[in-house]
From Swiss-Prot:
Location relative to the cell: Cytoplasm
Gene3D superfamilies: 3.90.950.10
Residue ranges of coiled coil: none
Database matches in InterPro entries: ITPase-like_fam, Maf-like
Catalytic activity annotation: dTTP + H2O = dTMP + diphosphate + H(+); UTP + H2O = UMP + diphosphate + H(+)
Protein name per its UniProtKB record: dTTP/UTP pyrophosphatase
Protein function: Nucleoside triphosphate pyrophosphatase that hydrolyzes dTTP and UTP. May have a dual role in cell division arrest and in preventing the incorporation of modified nucleotides into cellular nucleic acids.
Amino acid sequence: MPSLYLASASPRRRELLTQIGVPLSVLVTAIDESPLPNEAPAAYVERLARGKAAAGLAMLEGRGEDGCVLGADTSVVIDGRILGKPVDQADGLAMLAALSGREHQVLTAVALAAAGGVEARVVECRVRFRQVAPEEALRYWQSGEPADKAGGYAIQGLGAIFVSRIEGSYSAVVGLPLCETAELLREFGIPCWQPVGGNPP
């Protein structure tokens, strides 16, 4: 069975893979995450997921090791505009104001790379926020949670109270669509429900 490497420092993605019984090692890769001119959001997240997986595989091959590398990327999209991680407080508050009382898209791409090639899936979800008062948004920003989150919120954290409805995969909004990820892993010969950390699933 191939070893799985996660090309991400995201603790959320690591926890999701552990949840479905997939042992892994973490590889930290760095790629240029700037959108290309006129790049569609779905194409953007898929390109980044593939790029992270390919960069991780190149790192493995450079060490003379084999394995499968998983890359993923999540973006929040509203009015066709990609909301990345906020650069500062003003940016974070502007994101929350844009999302307040409205529906937005969350796009998550997952890619698996091995010596035989790269396969990817893109999953779209729709999330609706209730109205978020400015003072709430400020308190939320001051919690520290939004600073490193795409779109400036975490559905699995304190930001859950803003979400009135979700259509699609909850785990994809968190950062990894588990149904599609499990299908990809199976294609690459990696089963779910393995013992992780010495405990049976």
